[in-house]
Amino acid sequence: RMVELIKRGEPAVMLCHWPGMYTQGTKKGFTAFKRVVETLNSRFGDQTIWMKLSEIGRYWTAKELTRITFADRKISLNAPFGAPKFTVRVPGVVATNSPPRFIVENQTVALQGVTETRLLRSGTWHADSKGLVMCFDLPKGVSQIQW
């Protein structure tokens, strides 16, 4: 099922319980888990982001509760929770001559362009046939992206 979810670009979550990992001291469950992780990394490493459960919870809480408004080459975000490596896609937007700018409390930071979506890290952006993708550390409160 993990492979199906990853191929479709959907979130795929594995949850392991410590008793099952250690299998009464034999660590057979842990060995099996490591094998699954290695296999997924070898096949889907470019499209997989490993996160702890707390990181998933923070990201999805920010995703669901952040108010996002679009207006003329600008996105305004009002986030009740911050989230590192927050990613926004703006469909249909093509690359511009100047990089997108991330603005928080009157401080502006130009995002750095990357050549492929898989290279996105916090503070970067990429334009592809689907639009503009930007990744940044979303702060609690109000912020903007302009391009």
Region annotations inferred by a language model:
Residues 1-55:
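Catalytic grooves of carbohydrate-active enzymes
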Residues 35-83:
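Extended hydrophobic/aromatic segments used for targeting, binding, or gating
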Residues 63-147:
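C-terminal beta-sandwich/jelly-roll accessory domains of carbohydrate-active enzymes
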